[in-house]
Structures are given as structure tokens and as C-alpha cells.
């Protein structure tokens, strides 16, 4: 008889991918099936994120909410994975002795062994080491039932931006071998996947020196993936401006499966702040990348990340960020007020900007980008867009939704037989964050 697994995932798409891999390996080796009800679970896992402030406290809050379940189910195991686990390690067990397992992003493949050790010894198990590529070598083949899938091609970060905790929680950059990536993508396509999103903390830093084909950079990897029969679309996230090479830009000219959307975090429009962040590029260099991309694909959609209120940010610095938004015409952003992360260089910088000013700046920035997004969406009304139908709409379960090439979500009337296929949708209206449409050829 199978036992039940409950996973709560926080943070980025990489964590979503990792959670799916946890489920795969525990099904394969422990015959565990997923449940959405924690009370049913024999194993509860929290896959955590430490990018934002107070992430640790949120984890302990969630742990407190499930602690009582052990009273009625003494054999229940509770585990904490992800970046908070990497950052806090044994401190989690010290503060919450009822936690049985603590494991980092690079050791999730050892979950079956950690479970066995916990049951055998009665002691909490902590493993937050950084084995190089062992994680991917140990994972079972990917399983999916949808038309889209994530594929992790590299992990970690070697940039050490002054504000960022990722190098300390995910380790240095490590790329998967070319053959492993191609095998996973091809296997997903056989299962019905039409679109893959390639994942990495700095996905375009991918570099495989082990291939028999010679050194493989990210642009070359895209060339190989593009040749896989049955795959229709390729996305990737998150890219870094420092590795957005001329070769990568050229792929948008020769690879039609590469979608017309790029998420390219800038963080600030001020060269002074970018230098303090240790980002390694200037505004002119960033805008040059965008200009070259739009020369090849004039309608390409550009989204970004912004940090508002970084230590020392002046009104002038913020005005430069707003000007950059006007110049580039970003149509989506993930934007936050700076929050110091323990152990990062920026956490030691003096920060005398009042919170109310930071909050006002954030609202101004988000409103400007939302206006840009609305203008771009409005320009799509009455056009025909090719949409991959992903499933029922989140807004109305009687309708369906899918994504355009430029990453817009479209809601429309349809039927279940369309899921997993491409349909031509005429865009009829725009809402705050999505489009409405109708099937143009009544497929």
C-alpha cells in the first residue's frame, strides 16, 4: 500500500522543478503518492526560498501549523528543503526539534536515504552539502501529464551580487551534461510535452565541457534542443546580462521554436547602484542587448527584476530607473523593496532611506510597468495569436487558458479536447493581467 506525500513549495520555478523531482524519486523508491491535504500525509515537506526577508520566520510559522499532526500520527515525518534549509541547517532542528529531515537543493536526491536513516536511528537527519552533479545522476526519469514542463539545465550562481544569498544556498554554477539534458527533453516530448522551459539561476551561464561534441555553451545547447522532433516551443529563465552573448542573440534569428519573450533582470537603472550591487554591466551594455534583440525580433517581450531602495539609492538613481523603463518598455516585472539577506556584503551597507519613500518608489515603478503592459496588450486586440492550451482557466473553470508566444495568458471558451494542442485565438479584450479571446477557426 502506498503512503502519502505532501509538498508545499515556495519561491521560483527552480523550486517547482525540485518539488516535482522530490515527488518522482519518492514515488520511484518509496511508492509515495502526492496529496494536497497535509492531514493525509505520511511525509510533509516544505521546499523553501530565502530570497526575501523573513523567509526563515515564515518557515517556522508553517512548521508550527503542522506540528500537532504528529500527535495523532506519531510516524509522520516532517522535512524542510530548499534554500532556507541550506542557510539554516541544524538551526532548524534546534528551534523545531520535531523536524525530522533537513536537506538542501543539491541533496534532495538523498531523501530516501535520509528517511531510512531517520527511521533507523530515531535522530533528525541534516544534509546540506553541495555534491557537484550527483543530484541529477540519481533522479528518476521525468514524469508529466501536461503540455509544458520545466527542465533544469544548471544550478547555482558564481556571480556573488552583493545583495544575493543564492551562491551561499545553491552553491557555485554547475551545468548538466548535454546528453542528460537532451535525454530529459526528448523523454518529456514523448509524454506529450510541446513546450519546455529551461531553468537555471543563471541559465545562460550553461557550459558543458564533458560533451564529446566539444565545449557546449548555452546557444549551442539551444541549437541541439531545437532539433528534437515534436517540441514546438522553447523558453528559458532566468538569464543574466553578463552572459547574454552575441551568439545567444543570434539564436533568435535562426531558431523559430525560441519564443518571443526574454526575462532579463536589470535590478536598477542607475550605473552607480549596479556597481554597488556588483552586477558586472552598465545600462548602456544592457540597452545594447535589448536593441540587438529587437532588431532581430521587433515584437519581442522583455520582462525584468527590479530592487527598489537598495542602500544608498537616491532620488536621482530612482529617476534613472524610471527612465530606463520608458526607454526599454518592459511589459512585466518582479519588483521588490530591498531586504538585507544575512551574510551578504550589502547587508553591511548603511541604509538611511525611510521605508515610506521606498514603498512610494515601488508603487511608482509598478504602475509604470503596468501601463506599459496594458499598452502592449491593447495592441494585441483583434490580432490572431497562436496559443498552447494548458488547461482550465484559473478565473473560470468552465473556460480554458493558454500562453501566447510573448508570454501573455489568454482565457477563452473551449473544450477539454483542446488541452495540449495549439489553437489560433483572436484577441478580443484586455484585463489587468490577462487577455480574452475566442477560437478563430472553431477548432
Swiss-Prot record:
Chain residues that bind [4Fe-4S] cluster 2: 157, 161, 164
Catalysed reaction, written as an equation: N(6)-dimethylallyladenosine(37) in tRNA + (sulfur carrier)-SH + AH2 + 2 S-adenosyl-L-methionine = 2-methylsulfanyl-N(6)-dimethylallyladenosine(37) in tRNA + (sulfur carrier)-H + 5'-deoxyadenosine + L-methionine + A + S-adenosyl-L-homocysteine + 2 H(+)
Needed co-factor(s): [4Fe-4S] cluster
Compartment(s) of residence: Cytoplasm
Domain MTTase N-terminal: 3-120
Entry EC number(s): 2.8.4.3
Alphabetic keyword roster: 4Fe-4S, Cytoplasm, Iron, Iron-sulfur, Metal-binding, S-adenosyl-L-methionine, Transferase, tRNA processing
Pfam family, one: Radical_SAM
Record GO cellular component, one term: cytosol
Presence of keyword 4Fe-4S: yes
TRAM domain mapped to chain residues: 378-441
Gene3D superfamilies: Methylthiotransferase, N-terminal domain, tm_1862 like domain
Domain annotation Radical SAM core: ranges: 143-377
InterPro entries: Elp3/MiaA/NifB-like_rSAM, Methylthiotransferase, Methylthiotransferase_CS, Methylthiotransferase_N, Methylthiotransferase_N_sf, MiaB_methiolase, rSAM, rSAM_horseshoe
Protein residues bound to [4Fe-4S] cluster 1: 12, 49, 83
Oligomer and partners: Monomer.
Purpose of the protein: Catalyzes the methylthiolation of N6-(dimethylallyl)adenosine (i(6)A), leading to the formation of 2-methylthio-N6-(dimethylallyl)adenosine (ms(2)i(6)A) at position 37 in tRNAs that read codons beginning with uridine.
NCBIfam families the UniProt entry points to: miaB-methiolase, MiaB/RimO family radical SAM methylthiotransferase
Family classification: Belongs to the methylthiotransferase family. MiaB subfamily.
Name of the protein: tRNA-2-methylthio-N(6)-dimethylallyladenosine synthase
Organism: Nitrosomonas eutropha (strain DSM 101675 / C91 / Nm57)
Amino acid at each position: 500500500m502506498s503512503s502519502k506525500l505532501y509538498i508545499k513549495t515556495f519561491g521560483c520555478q527552480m523550486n517547482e522543478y525540485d518539488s516535482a523531482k522530490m515527488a518522482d524519486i519518492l514515488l520511484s523508491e518509496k511508492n509515495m503518492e502526492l496529496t494536497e491535504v497535509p492531514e493525509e500525509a505520511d511525509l510533509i515537506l516544505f521546499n523553501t526560498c530565502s530570497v526575501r526577508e523573513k523567509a526563515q520566520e515564515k518557515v517556522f510559522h508553517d512548521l508550527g501549523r503542522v506540528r500537532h499532526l504528529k500527535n495523532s500520527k506519531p510516524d509522520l515525518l516532517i522535512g524542510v528543503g530548499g534554500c532556507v534549509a541550506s542557510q539554516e541547517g541544524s538551526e532548524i532542528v534546534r528551534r523545531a526539534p520535531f523536524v525530522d529531515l533537513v536537506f538542501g537543493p543539491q541533496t534532495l536526491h538523498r531523501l530516501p536515504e535520509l528517511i531510512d536513516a531517520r527511521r533507523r536511528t530515531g535522530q533528525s537527519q541534516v544534509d546540506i552539502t553541495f555534491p557537484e552533479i550527483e543530484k541529477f545522476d540519481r533522479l528518476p526519469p521525468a514524469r508529466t501529464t501536461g503540455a509544458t514542463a520545466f527542465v533544469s539545465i544548471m544550478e547555482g550562481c558564481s556571480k556573488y551580487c552583493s545583495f544575493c544569498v543564492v551562491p551561499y544556498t545553491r552553491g557555485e554554477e554547475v551545468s548538466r551534461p548535454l546528453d542528460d539534458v537532451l535525454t530529459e527533453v526528448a523523454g518529456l516530448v514523448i509524454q506529450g510535452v510541446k513546450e519546455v522551459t529551461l531553468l537555471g539561476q543563471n541559465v545562460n551561464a550553461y557550459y558543458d565541457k564533458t560533451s564529446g561534441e566539444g565545449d557546449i555553451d548555452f546557444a549551442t545547447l539551444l541549437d541541439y534542443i531545437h532539433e528534437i522532433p515534436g517540441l514546438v516551443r522553447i523558453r528559458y529563465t532566468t538569464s543574466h546580462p553578463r552572459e547574454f552573448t552575441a551568439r545567444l542573440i543570434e539564436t533568435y534569428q535562426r531558431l523559430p521554436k525560441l519564443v518571443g519573450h526574454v526575462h532579463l533582470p536589470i535590478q536598477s537603472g542607475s550605473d552607480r547602484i549596479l556597481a554597488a550591487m556588483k552586477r558586472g554591466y552598465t545600462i548602456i551594455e544592457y540597452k545594447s542587448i535589448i536593441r540587438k534583440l529587437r532588431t532581430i525580433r521587433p515584437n519581442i517581450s522583455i520582462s525584468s527584476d527590479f530592487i527598489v531602495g537598495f542602500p544608498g539609492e537616491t532620488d536621482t538613481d530612482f529617476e534613472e530607473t524610471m527612465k530606463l523603463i520608458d526607454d526599454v518598455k518592459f511589459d512585466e516585472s518582479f519588483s521588490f523593496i530591498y531586504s538585507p539577506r544575512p551574510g551578504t556584503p550589502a547587508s553591511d551597507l548603511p541604509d538611511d532611506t525611510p521605508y515610506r519613500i521606498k514603498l512610494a518608489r515601488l508603487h511608482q515603478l509598478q504602475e509604470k510597468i503596468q501601463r506599459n503592459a496594458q499598452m502592449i496588450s491593447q495592441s494585441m486586440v483583434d490580432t490572431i495569436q497562436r496559443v498552447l492550451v494548458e488547461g482550465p482557466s484559473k478565473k473560470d473553470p468552465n473556460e480554458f487558458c493558454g500562453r501566447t508566444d510573448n508570454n501573455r495568458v489568454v482565457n477563452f471558451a473551449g473544450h477539454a479536447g483542446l488541452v495540449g494542442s495549439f489553437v489560433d485565438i483572436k484577441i478580443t479584450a484586455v484585463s489587468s493581467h490577462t487577455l480574452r479571446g475566442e477560437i478563430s477557426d472553431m477548432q
